[in-house]
Amino acid sequence: MKDTDIKRLLYTNLLCVFSIFLSIFIPSFFVDNFSVLEAHLTWLCICSASVTTVNLLSYLVVKPNVSSKRSSLSHKVTRALKCCVCFLMSCFLLHIIFVLYGAPLIELVLETFLFAVVLSTFTTVPCLCLLGPNLKAWLRVFSRNGVTSIWENSLQITTISSFTGAWLGAFPIPLDWERPWQVWPISCTLGATFGYVAGLVISPLWIYWNRKQLTYKNN
């Protein structure tokens, strides 16, 4: 493991963090009195688009998981379509899970679905960029001692931190503080966002700190 690889990971992750800050501040130049809380649905769409774009561009430029086999154009198109289908499936699956855990079934459907979209953006999109629509690779990465690179280590950390942040964000909702951010699903989306950002920042630092203990198996 080289320090240059960890630096590449750090810079890539910081770009993703920067994309979230852009989604917060850029709309205020075009929309009067723009606020993440007051225009929350709009911000969720902007944030998802921004993070997805940066993830795609980063992985296309950095290419952390380059295959030695040269694939045809039709194979690349098929792979891209499969990734889109997987992303949509993850959005609907998360939406169903949220409803099963107590989210409104009929009311606030759009809010719940956009929460599923943004959480899928933080978790599924990086997995698809790095691993593709390969179920075996996903199971390997998220199993014990299954990672083969620092990029997969970072993927583990950011995915877990995003879900943890979303879960912790649900705790303030039933409290009688009467704050605007307690409305479903604002606290959960903010929790997921903070968790994602924390994972992006912590993962390169954790990998650097434990670089001597970390060993990776070849694919």
From Swiss-Prot:
The chain crosses the membrane at residues 11-31, 42-62, 86-106, 113-133, 155-175, 189-209. The keyword Membrane applies. It holds the Pfam family PIG-F. This is GPI ethanolamine phosphate transferase, stabilizing subunit. Part of the ethanolamine phosphate transferase 3 complex composed by PIGO and PIGF. Part of the ethanolamine phosphate transferase 2 complex with PIGG. PIGF is required to stabilize PIGG and PIGO. GO terms for cellular component: endoplasmic reticulum membrane. It is a multi-pass membrane protein. Belongs to the PIGF family. It is found in: Endoplasmic reticulum membrane. GO terms for biological process: GPI anchor biosynthetic process. Keywords: Endoplasmic reticulum, GPI-anchor biosynthesis, Membrane, Transmembrane, Transmembrane helix. Its main location: endoplasmic reticulum. The gene is Pigf. The keyword Transit peptide does not apply. Stabilizing subunit of the ethanolamine phosphate transferase 3 and ethanolamine phosphate transferase 2 complexes that sequentially transfer an ethanolamine phosphate (EtNP) from a phosphatidylethanolamine (PE) to the 6-OH position of the third alpha-1,2-linked mannose and the second alpha-1,6-linked mannose of the alpha-D-Man-(1->2)-alpha-D-Man-(1->6)-2-PEtn-alpha-D-Man-(1->4)-alpha-D-GlcN-(1->6)-(1-radyl,2-acyl-sn-glycero-3-phospho)-2-acyl-inositol (also termed H6) intermediate to generate a 6-PEtn-alpha-D-Man-(1->2)-6-PEtn-alpha-D-Man-(1->6)-2-PEtn-alpha-D-Man-(1->4)-alpha-D-GlcN-(1->6)-(1-radyl,2-acyl-sn-glycero-3-phospho)-2-acyl-inositol (also termed H8). One of its GO terms (molecular function) is mannose-ethanolamine phosphotransferase activity. Pathway: Glycolipid biosynthesis; glycosylphosphatidylinositol-anchor biosynthesis. InterPro entries: GPI_biosynthesis_protein_Pig-F.
